[in-house]
């Protein structure tokens, strides 16, 4: 999928770019697989902001994606490739032989009319889903489970891919897109191939308004605030932050400080930290 650059007709289009949507084969979503989604806008159940810089954005219908691929040994045919406003990857509508329809993440190379299947005995082909124990070393996979039966949780963003680098006992070592090497049970399932829309990372929004369409609000620097609002605030003119190292609005170390808990359960499963 190619990137289309705007002509410099206005300041908002001068540096903007969009994808050409050449892979899309159908515009309207499957009605039975959509639902109304009221976004939290960064608030918790009490209405308190727990994630800053979220809010607004265009209304969206949620597309129910089948991350679990739980219909085992039932072949499915790819009907359409569609746009999903809730993620940067494309989605594919598949029709199972028993008449059921599902959405899955669209991997690179999967075409309309192809047949895919989730089965321990499936071939190593794009879009097929298998347990890690059945997938050979060096294979590129995505939509990986963390626990057997939990549904895919790892490697779901556009253009991402993980690689199986080793197997020992009941564990498989995966190199994730972040560079982290992690152990995952060989009973977990994964889908063959790389997630599609690999050029999504190279897009330039071009103007602040496109961020607002996505539900992203302005990220104000702490040094531009008053002392009552942020530890970096205050001072005359462009003053330094007045501290040895930067901190968050709540006084915790920020901008480079490691925040992962040392005694986290999954620490034993991480063989190499992310880069």
Curated annotation (Swiss-Prot):
Localisation: Plastid, Chloroplast
Region (Disordered): 222-258
A single GO cellular-component term on record: chloroplast
GO biological process: mitochondrial translation
Superkingdom of source: Eukaryota
Keyword Ribosomal protein (UniProt): yes
Keywords: Chloroplast, Plastid, Ribonucleoprotein, Ribosomal protein
Gene Ontology molecular function, alphabetical: rRNA binding; structural constituent of ribosome; transferase activity
The keyword Ribosomal protein is assigned to this record: yes
SMART domains: Ribosomal_L2, Ribosomal_L2_C
Subunit structure: Part of the 50S ribosomal subunit.
Record family assignment: Belongs to the universal ribosomal protein uL2 family.
Name of the protein in question: Large ribosomal subunit protein uL2c
Organism listed in the record: Chlorella vulgaris
């Amino acid at each position: 999928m190619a990137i289309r650059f705007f002509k410099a007709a206005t300041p908002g289009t001068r540096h903007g770019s969009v994808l050409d949507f050449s892979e899309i084969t159908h515009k309207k979503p499957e009605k039975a697989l959509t639902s109304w989604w009221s976004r939290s806008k960064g608030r918790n159940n009490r209405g308190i902001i727990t994630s800053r810089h979220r809010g607004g954005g265009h209304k969206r219908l949620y597309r129910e994606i089948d991350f679990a691929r739980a219909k085992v040994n039932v072949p499915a045919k790819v009907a359409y490739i569609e746009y999903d406003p809730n993620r940067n990857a494309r989605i594919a509508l598949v029709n199972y032989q028993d008449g059921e329809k599902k959405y899955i993440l669209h991997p690179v190379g999967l075409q309309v009319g192809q047949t895919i299947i989730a089965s321990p005995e499936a071939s190593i082909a794009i879009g097929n889903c298998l347990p890690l124990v059945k997938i050979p070393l060096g294979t590129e996979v995505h939509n990986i489970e963390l626990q057997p039966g939990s549904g895919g949780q790892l490697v779901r963003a556009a253009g991402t891919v993980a690689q199986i680098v080793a197997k020992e006992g009941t564990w498989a070592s995966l190199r994730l897109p972040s560079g982290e090497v992690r152990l995952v049970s060989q009973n977990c399932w994964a889908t063959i191939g790389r997630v599609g829309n690999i050029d999504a990372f190279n897009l330039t929004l071009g103007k602040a308004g496109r961020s607002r369409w996505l539900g992203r609000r302005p990220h104000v620097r702490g040094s531009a605030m008053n002392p009552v609002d942020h530890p970096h605030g205050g001072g005359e003119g462009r003053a330094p932050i007045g501290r040895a190292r930067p901190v968050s609005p709540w006084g915790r170390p920020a901008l480079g400080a490691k925040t992962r808990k040392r005694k986290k359960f999954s620490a034993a499963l991480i063989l190499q930290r992310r880069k």
